[in-house]
């Protein structure tokens, strides 16, 4: 098998990871509901900005409390043509009230060549 050098051309595959912080566990029900609504709005803004959601995954069926085995419980997979969409997404959460309750990280990769090649 020949392993070709990967391209770094759009669309970019982006994995957004979200986890609750200590603030989430100390928040009231109303604060959690507001944070959840705001997270949804922030993620929809990314789609309005050009991110194409491929899949979402919430790892809460067999886990309660702060995530320990993996540091995140919410995963959203996007394709984006412009990485500025991702920068705006991260900055939007960073500058919102949601940052008191949730943390977000984005990773840029590509489709797995042995499956999508």
Could you describe each region identified by the protein language model?
Residues 102-111:
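A generic structural motif
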Residues 83-91:
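Short amphipathic alpha-helices within nucleic acid-binding modules
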Residues 1-72, 80-83, 110-117:
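Short S/T/G/P-rich N-terminal loop/turn motif that feeds into the first structured element of a domain
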């Amino acid at each position: 098998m020949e392993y070709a050098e990967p391209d770094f051309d759009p669309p970019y595959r982006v994995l957004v990871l979200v986890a609750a912080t200590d603030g989430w566990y100390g928040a009231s029900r109303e604060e959690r509901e507001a944070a959840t609504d705001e997270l949804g709005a922030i993620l929809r803004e990314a789609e309005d900005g050009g991110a194409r959601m491929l899949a979402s995954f919430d790892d809460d069926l067999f886990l309660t409390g702060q995530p320990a085995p993996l540091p995140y419980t919410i995963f959203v997979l996007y394709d984006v043509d412009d990485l500025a969409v991702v920068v705006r997404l991260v900055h939007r959460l960073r500058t919102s009230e949601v940052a008191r309750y949730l943390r977000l990280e984005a990773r840029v990769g590509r489709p797995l060549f042995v499956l999508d090649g």
